[in-house]
């Protein structure tokens, strides 16, 4: 009896819940003002209200951050890197689960973006992220104030091709 119930629940998740989320929150769609509320678990803990969870220097480090938009029954949004809690940001939808979605922040600064943030962007894997970070480090080693003139030249120097799909993730 319990196996039937569990199997039925999984069937509903696969055949109804996930397709519904994909329709309501399509990949590439932008969710405005996501409020970040917990790190490395869906449960908000008292420690999450204190440093280092709320400090800006945590942004882009390894971990998972969960957030929601304000609403009566908001969807859970996961980012595959740490974001300071008690902050809000706009997010591009990058994936779907049965009851939640995955996203990456919009308008990140290409001069300060981390490897974890880069590798969370669809089409940029871990190897490409490290190539980009490596090229930025080489440039900064010569002159710490120097920056690439634009994102496309940064990608080109790293031997990677720029795709217009990447544009929402970076600030101009």
Per-segment meaning from a language model:
Residues 1-14:
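Single conserved hydrophobic/aromatic residue that forms the stacking wall/gate
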């Amino acid at each position: 009896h319990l196996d039937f119930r569990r199997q039925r629940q999984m069937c509903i998740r696969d055949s109804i819940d996930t397709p519904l989320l994909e329709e309501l929150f399509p990949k590439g769609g932008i969710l405005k003002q996501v409020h970040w509320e917990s790190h490395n678990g869906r449960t908000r803990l008292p420690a999450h209200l204190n440093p280092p969870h709320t400090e800006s220097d945590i942004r882009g480090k390894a971990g998972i951050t969960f957030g929601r938009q304000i609403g009566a029954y908001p969807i859970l949004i996961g980012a595959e890197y740490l974001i300071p809690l008690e902050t809000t940001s706009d997010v591009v939808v990058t994936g779907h689960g049965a009851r939640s979605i995955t996203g990456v922040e919009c308008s990140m600064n290409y001069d300060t973006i981390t490897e974890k943030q880069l590798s969370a962007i669809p089409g940029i894997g871990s190897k490409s992220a490290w190539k980009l970070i490596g090229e930025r480090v080489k440039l900064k080693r010569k002159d710490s104030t120097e920056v690439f003139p634009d994102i496309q030249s940064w990608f080109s120097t790293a031997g990677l091709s720029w795709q217009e799909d990447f544009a929402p993730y970076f600030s101009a």
